[in-house]
Regions:
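Histidine-rich, glycine-flanked metal-binding segment
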Residues: 1-19
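Active-site metal-binding loops of divalent metal-dependent hydrolases
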Residues: 25, 45, 53, 251, ...
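Residue-level marker for buried hydrophobic side chains located in beta-strands
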Residues: 7, 19-21, 247, 383
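Active-site neighborhoods of metal-dependent hydrolases
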Residues: 97-101, 107-109, 113-126, 131-135, ...
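A short helix->loop->beta-strand "cap" motif at the edges of active sites that frequently abuts
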Residues: 45, 193-194, 215, 245
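Di-metal (Zn2+ and/or Mg2+/Mn2+) metal-binding site signature of metallo-dependent hydrolases
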Residues: 15-37
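Acidic, glycine-rich active-site loops and adjacent beta-strand->loop/helix elements
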Residues: 26-29, 53-56, 223-225
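Divalent-metal coordination cores built from histidine and acidic residues
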Residues: 33-155, 191
Length: 406
């Protein structure tokens, strides 16, 4: 962070607490091999919430380990093999899972949501993907969630976003669950002061859960980025909290969605680009410094539909060690100012940065001004860093430092 503070406190030798609470981390796996919980521990976060988006590793029967690890891989892009080898998998129930986490001695406070995927699969097995639960099964799920909260979970998470798939292509358990199933679970979560995180829920489901006695709903929120959208979205969120409902949104603090470059993904199609993708980093760097190879890359990029990403929403993060998330010129504008094709600009900036340069497709929070207006709502809190997931794509672990600078 650059700039002078209005007040400086000498904290040498002191513990600075409390800090930021990061409520959307997906650090469930990483904590196994990185109990320091980097990089959020470097950005003032002192408490991390795991178990987001309906995905957790408990409860888990011994034969179901690969199922839960596989779903975490396909939804959150955390390698299954790293999950299987990085954790001891010596638990079945959620309380035992929390005991294991405590033994890891994480550097931050850790709070966990128990996930719908694990609970539903534990109760229903393979039927959990496609079938509705019986009344007895709904009650059994509620009892498991109640026990998890009594053993230390701070709430429950579910995911109704259909594109989130299991390894076999089916939407993850809970995606199509009846609203009554969630209400039954909310009946045991609310009275115990727990959170109900709803991902991808429609207005009717959210309303039904929020109106269950004691319910506190948490969900992901944002605005379109169009002029006035931030204020409008803030007002809508506040209106959702009328009539005694307790609904909190969480949103990105800056443009986020998909990062690409020589060190990560290369979303450009063509035979030469395929060759580049197959190389390791050193091989990629050597290849783009070959003039003939680069000419072939540019020629393929000039073809219609060579890149499906909206390039007018792609921004270069700069050549400095600290990424520039405030850049106002997108890749198309940069290429026009240099009288180049956008692929030539991409390759030139990549070479200038020795392959370290990254390009950010702002899928979410595309307009910082509107995002600031959105945060005028007292029912919205910053987050959605996804620090433990999509590491080569999003991983916005520095959001807390960023928001301090605004």
């Amino acid at each position: 962070m650059n700039g002078e503070a209005s007040e400086i406190i000498d904290a040498e030798g002191m513990t600075v607490t409390p800090g930021f609470v990061d409520i959307h981390t997906h650090l469930d796996a990483q904590i196994g091999w990185d109990p320091q919980m980097t990089p959020i521990c470097w950005h003032g976060v002192t408490t991390a919430l795991i178990g987001n988006c309906g995905l957790t590793f408990a409860p888990c029967k011994p034969d179901d380990v690969e199922i839960l690890a596989g779903m975490m891989e396909t939804v959150e892009d955390i390698p299954k093999q790293a999950i299987l080898s990085g954790l001891p998998w010596n638990w079945e129930h959620y309380g035992q899972y929390l005991d294991m986490l405590e033994e890891l001695k994480p550097s931050l406070n850790v709070a966990g949501l128990v996930g719908h995927c694990a609970v539903r699969y534990y109760v229903m097995g393979d039927r959990s993907f496609d079938e509705q639960a019986t009344e007895a099964e709904k009650q059994q799920m509620a009892e498991i969630v109640q026990k998890a909260i009594e053993d230390g979970a701070v709430g429950f998470s579910t995911n109704r976003y259909e594109p989130h798939k299991a390894p076999d292509g089916r939407s993850i358990p809970g995606t199509f669950a009846e609203c009554s199933e969630l209400v039954e679970i909310a009946k045991v979560v609310g009275p115990r002061d727990g959170l109900m995180q709803l991902v991808g829920a429609d207005a009717e489901v959210m309303k039904s859960v929020a109106e269950t006695e004691g319910s506190r709903v948490l969900f992901s929120y944002g605005c379109s980025g169009e002029e006035g959208s931030g204020t409008k979205a803030a007002m809508h969120l506040d209106e959702m909290n009328t009539e005694g409902r307790n609904i909190t949104g969480t949103s990105h603090t800056r443009g986020s969605g998909y990062m690409f470059g020589l060190q990560a993904g290369l979303p450009i199609q063509g035979p030469t680009w395929d060759i580049l993708r197959e190389k390791d980093f050193d091989g990629r760097l050597k290849a783009i410094n070959d003039e003939t190879f680069c000419e072939a890359l540019v020629a393929e990029a000039r073809e219609p539909k060579s890149c499906q990403i909206p390039l007018q929403k792609v921004y270069f993060l700069g050549l400095e060690d600290t990424p520039d998330h405030n850049s106002s010129q997108n890749l198309i504008e940069l290429s026009k100012s240099a009288s180049e094709h956008w692929s030539e600009t991409f390759l030139r900036l990549t070479k200038d940065s020795q392959g370290r340069g990254l390009f950010n497709w702002r899928m979410f929070s595309t307009n910082l001004k509107e995002q600031g207006d959105l945060f005028s709502s007292e029912n919205l809190i910053p987050g959605l860093g996804d620090v433990g997931a999509h590491v080569s794509q999003i991983m916005d672990g520095g959001w807390a430092s960023f928001i301090l600078s605004h």
